[in-house]
Regions:
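Conserved mixed alpha/beta catalytic, RNA-binding, or beta-rich assembly cores of soluble enzyme
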Residues: 11-28, 34-36, 43-47, 54-110, ...
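Short active-site-adjacent structural elements
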Residues: 98-99, 258-262, 283-286, 324-326
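C-terminal edge-of-domain segments
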Residues: 194-202, 206-210, 304-339
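Extreme N-terminal starter segment of soluble prokaryotic enzymes
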Residues: 1-5
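Glycine-rich, anion-gripping cofactor-binding loops and their flanking helix/strand elements
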Residues: 40-60, 287-304
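Conserved phosphate-binding/catalytic loops in two-lobed NTP-binding clefts
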Residues: 266-299
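Helix-rich interaction surfaces within compact, conserved domain-sized segments
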Residues: 119-121, 129, 297-312
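Short secondary-structure capping/turn segments at boundaries of alpha-helices and beta-strands
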Residues: 51, 76, 313-315
Length: 339
């Protein structure tokens, strides 16, 4: 985690040092006025608009030891989206109050404020309605559980609806704790929350929360390019109604560990790449689509299905083939939990 920390007075710098001690596992760059710039503090640059902009887009949190007004004026020109803006927090220079100003849920500002307040002996000033009313916060839960939010406008609608009553909730994964206030089991209604990897819409307006638990198994001819692999994967997922945001990994046999097109596909899609030996793939249990030709080349009767299941639980997509690329997909074990 990385953050930029801003202080504008000598006393503010003292509080900034306490913040850095509290967040010792963070990568934090502190800034202050040039006359106070010492002990690792970098001088604030000018003009302000040009100085804060690049920092805003490069950190996960911006922490101001200042007035709220100063912080708001400095970050306002750089706001883009609640999906991408960093957490913005303000502390008074005595470190008595910690105020999350921006990205309280998706950016994690609320949780960071609570953690800082506990460490500093300060008061976290939380103003988001779901938090102060003890209701389910859909965007915070999604971030904490590694789920993509399919629609931010619908997330906003759900956040408003849980303040008025219970919103129906449906999950393809086992729910192993009680539902929080604001959610109730249901599979129909005007507005509801669905947790799963499929692009299903059980409610008239369905907010889909997509856990990243799908592992691809990919086989391909030598020299297959990135776009051919992407087209084969997208076709296989679309045919089974699987949201691409659910994919976390692509796996294959170790003979493909240097396959440029496959590696390029993984990089561009933000996927980890895993490669297994023929012995490791043969050890995977299940019913697979065999190929004597593949076995003669690789030593194992099926690469894509076995690779997908090597560290997963349920095969979602059996072997599909397109343009010399074979694709399978499997889901890891996953559970829905509410604190």
């Amino acid at each position: 985690m990385n953050a930029a920390l801003f202080a504008y007075s000598r006393r503010g710098c003292a509080t900034a040092r306490r913040i850095m001690a509290a967040l010792a596992d963070w990568d934090i760059q502190p800034y202050t006025m040039e006359r106070f710039a010492e002990d690792g503090f970098a001088p604030l640059g000018r003009p302000a608009r040009e100085f804060y902009g690049p920092i805003f887009g490069d950190v996960q949190a911006m922490i101001f030891v200042s007035s709220v007004g100063l912080a708001v004026r400095e970050v306002a020109p750089h706001l883009k989206s609640k999906a991408t803006d960093p957490a913005v927090l303000v502390l008074d220079e005595l470190g008595q109050y910690v105020i999350p100003v921006l990205s309280g849920h998706i950016g994690g500002a609320n949780e960071l404020a609570k953690a800082l307040a506990a460490s500093l002996g300060a008061q976290a000033v939380i103003t988001t309605a779901t938090d102060i009313n003890g209701r389910f916060s859909v965007d915070a839960w999604a971030v904490q559980n590694g789920c993509a939010i399919a629609s931010l406008p619908l997330a906003k609608a759900v956040s408003a609806a849980v303040l008025e009553g219970d919103v129906p909730f449906l999950s393809d994964f086992p729910v192993v704790t009680d539902l929080p206030r604001g959610l109730a089991p249901g599979d129909a209604g005007a507005l509801g929350v669905y947790v799963g990897v499929y692009e299903k819409t059980p409610f008239a307006k369905t907010l889909r929360l997509v856990p990243r638990v799908v592992r691809l198994g990919i086989g391909c001819r030598k020299g297959t390019d990135e776009e051919t692999i992407r087209a084969a994967v997208n076709e296989a997922l679309a045919a089974h109604g699987i949201d691409r945001r659910a994919v976390k990994c692509a796996a294959s046999i170790d003979l493909k560990a240097e396959e440029a097109g496959l590696l390029a596909y993984c990089r561009s899609e933000g996927l980890s790449a895993e490669f297994y030996t023929a012995d490791e793939l043969r050890a995977v249990r299940g019913e697979f689509t065999p190929s004597e030709f593949v076995k003669s080349i690789t030593g194992v009767d099926n690469v894509c299905e076995r690779a997908a299941l090597r560290n997963a639980e349920t095969l979602l997509v059996k072997k599909t083939a397109r343009s010399g690329v074979t694709v399978a997909a499997a889901a890891e074990h996953w559970e829905v939990r509410f604190a």
